[in-house]
């Protein structure tokens, strides 16, 4: 009895920055970094991010993804990688990989791993940074995601909800620019 897992590297399979799966597809507006194409000159004849948003709105992204990886096997791991993002365009001290993993029961977790020796120190400090930020912002109404350190990784709880970016995008799309501006400045004032 074979089982299959589908993965979708983005922007392509040669230089993926992010890898999605059927268990974690991109959100609308997330596929906006399409300038990475190192193997040949490329003309951009249309706004690709708008096309991706249309595909996502119609649940068609897997059928039109630029590339895919299909893993087939008899056994599936207990903890399955649903999403991976590589932050290798940063300074080597912050060159990390973020993974979202899930279990059969639907539980999800977020882990950050160092991709370089220099980034290990950054990962080891994330738990303390999380605690310090929680203390700093506790009176502001901002909750900081809980972090616990592991052996060469930092784990965060997976949170469901609407991001500030998604809320701002919705307000702008609805033409509510005054509300979007007010919301943005409310948050910038909170984190000053």
Report residues per predicted region.
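ATP-binding glycine-rich loop module of kinase domains
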Residues: 82-132, 167-168
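Conserved catalytic/acceptor-binding region of the Class I
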Residues: 1
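Feature marks short, surface-exposed loop/turn motifs that line or immediately flank catalytic pockets
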Residues: 12-14, 117, 162-163
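Rossmann-like AdoMet/SAM-dependent catalytic core
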Residues: 4-93, 97-99
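Residue-level recognition of conserved beta-strand positions in structured domain cores
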Residues: 8, 113, 157-158
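Conserved short submotifs of the Hanks-type protein kinase catalytic core
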Residues: 151-163
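Short beta-strand micro-motifs within the conserved protein kinase catalytic domain, predominantly
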Residues: 141-153
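Conserved kinase catalytic-core helix
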Residues: 126-141, 165-192
